[in-house]
Amino acid sequence: TATTAGMAATQTCASATARPRALEQYRAARARYRQAKATLKAAERQVTPVDAFGNRKPRLRGWQHLITLPLCIAASIVLICIAPAGPVKAACAIYGASAILLFGNSALLHVVPWRSAKVTRVLCGIDYSNIFLIIAGTNTPVLFALSPSIRWPYLTVIWAAALVGTVMHIVWLRAPNWAFTVVYVVLGLAPVTLLPALWTAPAVGPAATVLIACGGAAYIAGATCFAIRKPNPIPGWFEFHEVFHMGTVIGYTCHVVAIYLVVCAL
């Protein structure tokens, strides 16, 4: 009995000693994990380029828009040439100019390795403002397929909102992502109320209406990724901002095809 009691006491002591040791080992392993994670992030910052403000800048930032720019210029020129003379041609010119400004300034901002914070800040303000201009510009030629009683009120509201958004982003350059996204999505959803009228309009019809809706969905999906800063498919190369840019390219493609269909039917 004495032997058994002694063995039990020994086991209890060993167990009591092992617990703190296991806890120490766990804490040490956790500390090593945190250190490795910090080292990895530091190495990632050294490998991944940064902008003038010190923010990480994945290598493919802006290249989607740079590739899209010459295609956008060509599409805009052809669209203006085939558009009927008068207000419709002017509307197509406005749309083309807003698209070229969007992709051109974005490529200039994101691809060129600016080191001047002042230049970067100005280009950022223009970049954010262009979002509102492309939304208003896209709606302009499409609205000429509808009656004047619908066209002019919508043009007034959309361009007024675009002007407000543009001024806001020029004055409030450091606006948080969520504030920018909320205004962007609200303005993008405004034309949704026109979808029934577009569906039945002789110069628009179902095909162009579906393309317009899909383009809007692509813009909104990209903006959502920008707001939540996810996903980041290839860290250091292709992250949430690049996903946002792809959304704008897909949205533009859907819309420019739809506008071609509308203009050819006018």
Language model segments and positions:
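Multi-pass alpha-helical transmembrane bundles in non-GPCR membrane proteins
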Residues: 1-266
